UniProtKB/Swiss-Prot annotation:
Region annotation (Disordered) ranges: 1-117
GO biological process: positive regulation of transcription by RNA polymerase II; transcription initiation at RNA polymerase II promoter
Oligomeric form and interacting partners: The 1.2 MDa TFIID complex is composed of TATA binding protein (TBP) and the 14 TBP-associated factors.
InterPro entries recorded: TAF4 (IPR045144), TAF4_C (IPR007900)
Organism, scientific name: Eremothecium gossypii (strain ATCC 10895 / CBS 109.51 / FGSC 9923 / NRRL Y-1056) (Yeast)
Protein name: Transcription initiation factor TFIID subunit 4
Length: 361
């Protein structure tokens, strides 16, 4: 029968268990004589970290587990027994076992402080107390700086006087059966003053914008848009020129006298006078004007008098075409304010009605 490669390799090794090389020059390990694999040996002869706690249990009846400890195990021992395995242990392994026991004995002393055990940041070298002290000092410094800056900023004066606002609010609240003294509510008075300021500012801003648009010249479509309007305007100009020539001819012949002192009232003046008279009559005034009652009849001799203007010319008055330049008031006028108030929906109905009643061109 042929030999197995394992038996051949064992034959090449020496009796002393030295390393051997095969035919290809590779090392296969160390062969020991009379060594057989056995199970783990957890005998009591081996020193363990728990041996240090025997004396402590008797004194304080309290045992603390070590932070780190590993039981010494022997996975492969010679067939001679546990005593021969312990005797063959190298000095380096014995030294390591002693260091482990020392570490296990010193661990409870280091972990006895609860403050150090509860703080995980202590192992990283962070001092919590020092950090808290630094944070509190920073907050105190920021508060002091903010107080200094606030004291240096001047107070903004209110738009409306607080006492006047409080009296007005009290009056309006009394109308709604709600009695309260608002003079002590400084924050509420400041809020109402700011709201009034914003309301009036908005109205004035809109009025300024409307005034600028009103005075701005329109450059596009400045010519006449309708041919009919142009023809009617030319006819009116010719008729006015003819009427002026006729009046001049009659004045030259002595039929009419040129008006110098007497001024004919325009339609606007008559309208204002009639309104003033109507207001006086409504108010209960006793004064009456002759032109409101049936006046005396005009004598025929007055019309024949050449020194007076004829009734036709007097009746004509300023009727006809009026030439005037386009006149726009500078700044903000009443119609600009009314236009700005028309965009409001609450509390402006009476104001708009009074404004249109007083507006005058």
């Amino acid at each position: 029968m042929g030999k197995s490669p394992k038996a051949a390799d064992q034959g090449d090794t020496g009796a002393g268990g030295k390393k051997t090389k095969g035919e290809d020059g590779f090392s296969f390990g160390i062969d020991a004589e009379e060594v057989e694999p056995t199970g783990s040996d957890f005998s009591n002869d081996m020193p363990t970290p728990f041996d240090n706690f025997v004396g402590q249990d008797e004194q304080s009846n309290r045992a603390e587990l070590p932070e780190s400890g590993q039981p010494a195990t022997t996975l492969a021992l010679p067939a001679g027994g546990a005593g021969s395995g312990a005797g063959r242990k190298s000095p380096q392994k014995m030294q390591r076992a002693g260091m482990r026991r020392a570490a296990g004995a010193g661990a409870p002393k280091q972990q006895s402080d609860p403050d150090k055990l509860s703080d995980a940041l202590l192992s990283a070298g962070v001092d919590i107390k020092e950090e808290e002290a630094l944070l509190s000092s920073t907050v105190t410094t920021m508060k002091s700086n903010s107080q200094v800056s606030n004291s240096q900023i001047p107070l903004h004066p209110p738009f409306l006087h607080p006492s006047h606002v409080a009296s007005m609010m009290k009056k309006v609240a009394a109308e709604q059966n709600f009695n309260q003294d608002f003079s002590k509510s400084s924050e509420l008075l400041s809020l109402m003053s700011t709201a009034c300021e914003l309301y009036i500012r908005d109205i004035i801003t809109n009025s300024i914008i409307i005034s600028r648009h009103r005075r701005k010249a329109v450059k596009l479509n400045s010519g006449r848009r309708s041919e009919t309007t142009r023809v009617l305007r030319d006819l009116a100009l010719k008729q006015r020129e003819q009427e002026e020539r006729r009046v001049k001819r009659r004045i030259a012949l002595g039929l009419e006298k040129e008006i110098t002192d007497t001024k004919l009232d325009s339609g606007e003046t008559l309208h204002r006078a009639s309104n003033a008279t109507a207001n006086m009559m409504i108010a209960g005034g006793k004064k009456k004007y002759s032109w409101l009652t049936s006046g005396s009849k005009v004598n025929a001799t007055d019309l024949k008098n050449p020194g007076k203007v004829s009734s036709a010319v007097a009746a004509r008055g300023d009727l006809g075409i009026k030439f005037r330049e386009a006149r726009e008031e500078p700044g903000i006028v009443m119609r600009d304010l009314l236009h700005a108030l028309e965009n409001r929906r609450v509390g402006v109905n009476n104001t708009i009605a009074k404004g249109y009643a007083r507006i005058r061109d």
